[in-house]
């Protein structure tokens, strides 16, 4: 949870995750500290924690060889934080989440070429990062504004080895685009091997 506080019923167990950042120049050895637990109705309690630092230093996460590929879901972050998708407030809310992922050695940026390529397998549909527009003369144009902003944002955090683009063959072969003649968005089925697929792709 990214909450500053929450209520717990009495006799209920709630795990707590504690992250400790260790500077690279820290000498090896055992380090002790206390965790203070406070409540408005009970006295303060102390828990002892011990941390053993070994004589080994990890390289920067971007240099780790393990290929970590956790899919990102920006739309979910927008809903939880009650902000508009792709707004400045959205990217501000995304930063701590994605920075945490970068610090774990994430190598891949998840992007969506079209709206919800997995046909809503998650609570929040995936928003498209590229706006496809069928112009009045039948030609196609593509707005990469969101795609470029998202990729640059992730690369600035240190995630830059690979970009996964989903998907040339989306769920149900459905393509989402804007019809310039009507100003409305249209969903059309374009199966591989058909004239419609060739024309769109």
What does each model-found stretch correspond to?
Residues 1-18:
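Surface-exposed binding patches on compact interaction domains or structured appendages
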Residues 14-15, 27-34:
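Short, solvent-exposed loop/turn segments enriched in Ser/Thr/Gly
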Residues 1-4, 26, 43:
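Short beta-strand and strand-turn-strand segments in soluble, beta-rich domains
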Residues 21, 32-39, 45-201:
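Aromatic-lined carbohydrate-binding surfaces of glycoside hydrolases
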């Amino acid at each position: 949870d990214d909450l500053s506080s929450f209520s717990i019923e009495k006799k209920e167990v709630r795990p707590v995750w504690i992250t400790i950042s260790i500077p690279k120049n820290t000498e090896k050895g055992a380090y002790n500290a206390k965790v203070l637990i406070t409540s408005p109705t009970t006295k303060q309690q102390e828990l002892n924690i011990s941390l053993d630092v070994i004589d080994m230093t990890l390289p920067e996460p971007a240099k780790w060889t393990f290929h970590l590929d956790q899919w990102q879901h920006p739309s979910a972050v927008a809903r939880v934080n009650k902000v508009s998708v792709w707004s400045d407030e959205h990217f501000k809310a995304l930063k701590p989440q994605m920075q945490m992922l970068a610090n774990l050695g994430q190598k891949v940026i998840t992007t969506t070429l079209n709206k919800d390529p997995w046909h809503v397998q998650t609570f929040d549909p995936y928003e498209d990062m590229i706006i496809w527009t069928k112009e009045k003369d039948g030609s196609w144009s593509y707005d990469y504004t969101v795609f470029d902003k998202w990729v640059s944002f992730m690369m600035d955090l240190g995630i830059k080895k690979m970009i996964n683009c989903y998907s040339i063959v989306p769920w149900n072969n459905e393509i989402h685009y804007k019809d310039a003649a009507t100003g409305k968005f249209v969903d059309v089925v374009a199966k591989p091997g058909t004239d419609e697929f060739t024309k769109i792709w």
